[in-house]
A protein has these predicted regions:
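Catalytic alpha/beta core domains of metabolic enzymes, predominantly
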Residues: 197-198
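NAD(P)-dependent Rossmann-like dehydrogenase/reductase catalytic/cofactor-binding core
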Residues: 2-7, 15, 22-190, 202
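Acidic, glycine/proline-rich low-complexity segments that act as flexible tails and inter-domain linkers
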Residues: 193-194
Length: 202
């Protein structure tokens, strides 16, 4: 391993932590939701916020700053002000009884918060833009919804983008962003299905 800012493990986990913090900072998901997705869909033992609390905010926030500065402020490694605020407040994770989560004297989480949204009534029909996507078609078939190959102007429109958000995908495909739902099929969908909508979606 060559000489580089941060230990190898810090660099390996940088993307997971910084992306998790960015998603939370943008209000897309809570720490408990992000951690649950990483555990259930990606096979990790714990998510980025659980890991930060375990190792200690007093360890991982300074390390993140060193890596960011060492790579000449590469924007992909930008620290989060929320991370810094926990550090400044002395909420250092399990060792202080609170970080991203609150902990009891034994180190167990106290009311971690819901890791999934409240259930809603499923749609009776959906529009699938890529009917050749066997995984997406299989999920809808298992749910019992009627699959439409063309837009009827009122049903939810399902897409399965990789590396793009819901809004960008809807615009590129000429779809109604208010009815478009992006489904993440890159991970394990047996325990959890992660979806994304555009701002202002119905």
């Amino acid at each position: 391993v060559g000489d580089t800012p941060g230990f190898l493990v810090n660099l390996g986990g940088t993307a997971i932590g910084t992306e998790g913090l960015r998603i939370m900072q943008e209000g897309r998901a809570t720490p408990s939701q992000i951690d649950a997705v990483m555990r259930d869909s990606c096979g990790f033992r714990m998510g980025p916020f659980e890991l930060m609390d375990l190792t200690g905010i007093d360890v991982n926030f300074p390390a993140r700053k060193i890596i960011y500065e060492g790579f000449f402020h590469d924007r992909r490694m930008t620290p989060s002000p929320y991370h810094e605020s926990l550090y400044a407040a002395g909420r250092l994770g399990r060792k202080t009884g609170g970080g991203w989560y609150a902990y009891d004297a034994k180190g167990a989480k106290v009311d971690p918060g819901a890791d999934h949204p409240t259930s809603t009534v499923p749609a009776s029909s959906v529009v699938i833009m890529d009917t050749h996507n066997k995984k997406l078609v299989g999920l809808i078939a298992a749910d019992g919804a009627k699959m439409l190959g063309a837009d009827d102007g009122k049903s939810p429109i399902l897409v399965a983008p990789i590396g793009k958000d819901c809004t960008t995908t809807a615009i590129e495909l000429g779809l109604d962003p208010k009815r478009t739902i992006a489904v993440d099929l890159t991970g394990d969908t047996a325990k959890r299905l992660t979806i994304m909508t555009a701002p202002g979606a119905d």
